[in-house]
Swiss-Prot record:
This is NADH-ubiquinone oxidoreductase chain 6. The gene is MT-ND6. Belongs to the complex I subunit 6 family. InterPro entries: ComplexI_Subunit6, NADH_UbQ/plastoQ_OxRdtase_su6, Nuo/plastoQ_OxRdtase_6_NuoJ. One of its GO terms (cellular component) is mitochondrial membrane. It is a multi-pass membrane protein. Disulfide bonds: none annotated. GO terms for molecular function: NADH dehydrogenase (ubiquinone) activity.
Amino acid sequence: MTYFVLFLGLCFVLGSLAVASNPSPYYGVVGLVLASIAGCGWLLSLGVSFVSLVLFMVYLGGMLVVFVYSVSLAADPFPEAWGDWGVVGYGVGFVAVLMVGLIVGGFVGSLDFGVATVDSVGMFSVRLNFSGVAMFYSCGVGMFLVAGWGLLLTLFVVLELVRGLSRGAIRAV
């Protein structure tokens, strides 16, 4: 199980790297799907299945819509590939930042934060999964509204960034 969780963590980092250094929106979708599946699987391994399911639906339901719009509006005749020097430079830079973070985190890692697991106190403990459901629907209404507005803002930002110098979705008619 430990190796599987480490594999999910590696897939999450590689998917995030693929989203951060994507040469065209086509490849960004692949990185986003890989990172969201790995991150939600990581949460699932901690026992927080409802939060994992909600995040998976938000990522794939909300953000893939943004990428579909951007792919349809930024139809490049010759998109850059992963092997281009600019993309490789971004990848090497991000891996260098990750390594520096791991080295610094190794020195700071002696603080021993830890993770609370499910059912650690016996029959009388409340699972993190079910308390999360109650918090989502009682105190989390404002955060759902903020997340919805954030996704709408992200849609417009990506549509503006994708259009570049050519025509885009938001243009003067």
